[in-house]
Structures are given as C-alpha cells and as structure tokens.
Amino acid sequence: MTVSKFVQIRRDLHRIPEIGFKEWKTQQYILDYIGTLSHEFVEVKTWKTGVIVKVNGKNPEKIIGYRADIDGLPITEETGYEFASIHEGMMHACGHDVHTTIGLGLLTKAVSERIDDDLVFLFQPAEEGPGGALPMLESEELKEWKPNIILGLHIAPEYAVGTIATKEGLLFANTSELYIDLKGKGGHAAYPHTANDMIVAASHLVTQLQSVISRNVNPLDSAVITIGKITGGTVQNIIAEKSRLEGTIRTLSVESMKRVKSRIESIVAGIEASFQCEAIIDYGAMYHQVYNHEELTREFMEFVHKQTDMNVITCTEAMTGEDFGYMLREIPGFMFWLGVNSEYGLHHAKLKPDEEVIEKAITFLSQYVKWKGNRK
C-alpha cells in the first residue's frame, strides 16, 4: 500500500527513536530532508542534537516560530507496526515523530508558498528530559532568530482526528522530578537492633508524603505527588542500608510548587531524625507551566473555527508537563492538543496515532501561518 510522503516520513522517524540529547540519527534525518528544500532564503543551524531552520520572508515585520520536540522514550514498543522501533527499549510513545513530521510538512509549505514574515522552525531535543527548550531558547544559535510569536502542539489520543483543543491562559502544569536517597546502616536480618532499615524508612516516607497534597494545598488548586519507583536492599536476609524513591510533582501554580517542595523537605528532615539516617533530595528536571497568551490563543481558535475544516473545542487545564512552557514564558504564543484517536494513551507501549492527522495538521497550520504572516 502506497502512503503519502509525510506519512512515510513519520514512519521513518518512528523507527529511530532516541532519548534526550542523543537524537543523532533523528537530527541527520531532519537535516537530510531540509537539504532537499534548499533555497537562498532558507538558513539552517544545528544546536546540540536539534535543528533550527529559518525561512526568510518576502517583507518581514516579525518572526513566527513553530516548535517540534524530536526525542523518544525508554519504552519497549508493543504496537505491532511493520515500521516499529529498531532501537531496542526505545519508542516514540509520546507522538514526537508526529510533531516533527508536521513541522517538516509546514516547513515544506513555507518554502513553496513563501509568506511576508520570517518563519523559524525549532526541532528541539530532550523534551522528555532533561529538558531542551530552555537551553535552546538561551542559545547563541537562536539569539538572532528568536521568534516574536511561537506555537506548538501535542497529540491527544482521546480526541478525534479533525479536532483540536486548547484554552486561553494556563494549559499545562508546573512539573518537577523527585528523587530521594536514604542511607542508614545495613545488617543481618536476624539482628535488626544492630542495623538501621532503609526500607522501613522509605515506607514511612511514602506514607507521610500522601499528606502533603491533602493537607497543604488548597483543594481548588490541584497538585499531585506520585512516587512511581522504589528501590532498596540486596537480598531477602540482609537489612537494607540504602533505599531510593523516584517520583514526580505537578502543580497548577508556582506558589503551590514552592509549598509542596517545602513540605517534602520538612518531612524528609523528620525521617532523618526518626530513623537516624541521611537523606538527599534531588528535584531533577523542572518544567515551567504552559501558559497560553490570551489574545493570540483566542485569535487562533476563532481562525480555526471560521476558516478551516477543523473542529476546535475549549478544554480544561491538565497536569501534563511540557518544557515548551519556558518558551511561552518569554515569547507570546500558545500550545494546543491535536486529536489522533488512539485507543492507548501517551507513554503507552501500544500508542498508535491515526496517521490521517498528519496531512490535516499540515494543511490547517499552513493556512493559519499564511493568514498570520502575510500583510493584509
């Protein structure tokens, strides 16, 4: 069965998922494709494993940016695709292959249907961690090409193809990784009084962390602490000297994030005192909330509703994390959900976005960019 050019690009990218700042094959694929679009008004830069492309407009007054994240996840794929990942233990389970393909399609349209304003395409690495948006934004490579307006999208398995969803203001939460290492004194299981059990300490800590949200955050201001992984000990008859908790924090306000972290630190200090152990807290990667520019978002939604065949709906904010929030903190713009109608959700080994969405997204985004970037 013959597939369209951009569906094939998505499948090519799907086969080569790579984790943050190791997207060398993906970067080269993007560069090779851009090479086929060579024009005197197209400029290309690389930044780490990312790519930045500028299409110089005919009569520019501003720079419009489109950001696509390009990294995959450390997940073993279970889609059954003929074009499944060839990289063991890695998968495009968050749709970044689709995001990148749409970006390349939009770039292709921008070259063949040149507009007045400049366009900059940011093919950004490491969205899944440790975070590529902020360092790319602050890079010398982007300094002269920094957009005046920027947009981004994320696939949404729960919405039908042909539907987009977004809202003015807060869209995605503030997020932070959470790692807590406990160190005590190990020993023989028969002599617990001579040791200091870090599995017991970790168990108490997990239980106490459950009170942080329920008793310290306003019920109208949502927040989440999830401990997703606990490790500790070596064998069944040795008391554990060390244990490690790994999790995530998500809040809808910066103030709540500060409050939650403060309470975590107080509780951990209490565990140290109670169990006479040492504890180290590491917050890992932290992402700023995605806050859509009200006027630009409202204008975009009205345009999509009135001038395209896409269905646009107003959604509620989500506890999802996205480092695109750093870009929106400095540049007016917006992000939206793009429906892909998948039975399985994001970060699932069986995620299968409907590829029909690719051409639809390229078409309506090209319409919007031309409307926004041409003199009226």
Curated annotation (Swiss-Prot):
Origin species, per record, is Bacillus cereus (strain B4264)
Q: Which residues form the active site?
A: D69, E128 (proton acceptor)
Write the protein's name: N-acetyldiaminopimelate deacetylase
User: Which HAMAP family does this entry report, sorted A to Z?
Assistant: DapEL
**Could you say which enzyme class this protein belongs to?**
hydrolase
Its Enzyme Commission number?
Answer: 3.5.1.47
Its biological purpose is as follows:
Catalyzes the conversion of N-acetyl-diaminopimelate to diaminopimelate and acetate.
Pfam families per UniProt: M20_dimer, Peptidase_M20
Instruction: Name the UniProt key words of this record, in alphabetical order.
Output: Amino-acid biosynthesis, Diaminopimelate biosynthesis, Hydrolase, Lysine biosynthesis
Please list the reactions this protein catalyses: N-acetyl-(2S,6S)-2,6-diaminopimelate + H2O = (2S,6S)-2,6-diaminopimelate + acetate
Top-level lineage group: Bacteria
- GO molecular function, a single term: N-acetyldiaminopimelate deacetylase activity
Q: Where are the transmembrane segments?
A: none
Q: In which pathway does it act?
A: Amino-acid biosynthesis; L-lysine biosynthesis via DAP pathway; LL-2,6-diaminopimelate from (S)-tetrahydrodipicolinate (acetylase route): step 3/3
Q: Which Gene3D superfamilies match?
A: 3.30.70.360, Zn peptidases
Q: Which GO terms describe its biological process?
A: diaminopimelate biosynthetic process; lysine biosynthetic process via diaminopimelate
The UniProt entry's sequence similarity note says: Belongs to the peptidase M20A family. N-acetyldiaminopimelate deacetylase subfamily.
